[in-house]
């Protein structure tokens, strides 16, 4: 890595260095040959906020069709991206959502509560739900079961009206 754009990728949490590089002309929407963008490497809300303020596209995709939401692991940063228009049901070239790329229950809860569909099937027929069930993520199964019960309770009066 030696270009100014590539340097943006290695300073994911260093806001001072990120600002210096952007002010020196680094492209906030740069996509590396590996499919990384400055926003996908942002490790803090502060860095993501700065990049968006300088024109970074919250829904920019790499050649695999992945957005920053697929790779950002910090839950607060993910929340910030969602609050700023990141599409939670965006699918990549394999028809996978960001859910397919996390096993962190905090990020899973955030994505599902923001409307990401855990039952979306990838082109090879897999669902995030199935992958976690296979890996014995009981907390995820319980979370979805409780969410379904809440939805049924909320929708019960509507169902009775028909």
Enumerate the language-model features and the residues they cover.
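Ankyrin-repeat-protein effector appendages
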Residues: 1-8, 114-162
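Ankyrin-repeat helix-start
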Residues: 3-6, 38-39, 68-69, 98-99, ...
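Ankyrin repeat A-helix N-terminal signature
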Residues: 9-13, 41-45, 71-75, 101-105, ...
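N-terminal segments that cap or nucleate solenoid repeat domains
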Residues: 1-34
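Ankyrin repeat structural motif
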Residues: 14-22, 45-53, 75-83, 105-113, ...
């Amino acid at each position: 890595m030696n270009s100014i754009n590539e340097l943006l990728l290695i300073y994911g949490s260093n806001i001072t260095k990120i600002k210096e590089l952007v002010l020196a002309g680094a492209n906030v929407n740069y996509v590396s040959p590996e499919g990384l963008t400055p926003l996908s490497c942002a490790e803090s809300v502060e860095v993501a906020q700065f990049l968006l303020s300088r024109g970074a596209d919250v829904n920019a995709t790499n050649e695999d069709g992945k957005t920053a939401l697929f790779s950002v692991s910090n839950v607060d940063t993910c929340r910030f991206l969602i609050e700023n228009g990141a599409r939670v049901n965006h699918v990549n070239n394999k028809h996978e959502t960001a859910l397919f790329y996390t096993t962190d229950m905090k990020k899973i809860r955030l994505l599902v509560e923001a409307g990401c569909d855990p039952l979306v099937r990838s082109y090879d027929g897999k669902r995030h739900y199935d992958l976690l069930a296979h890996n014995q993520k009981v907390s995820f199964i319980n979370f979805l079961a409780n969410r379904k019960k809440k939805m049924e309770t909320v929708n019960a009066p509507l169902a009775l009206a028909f």
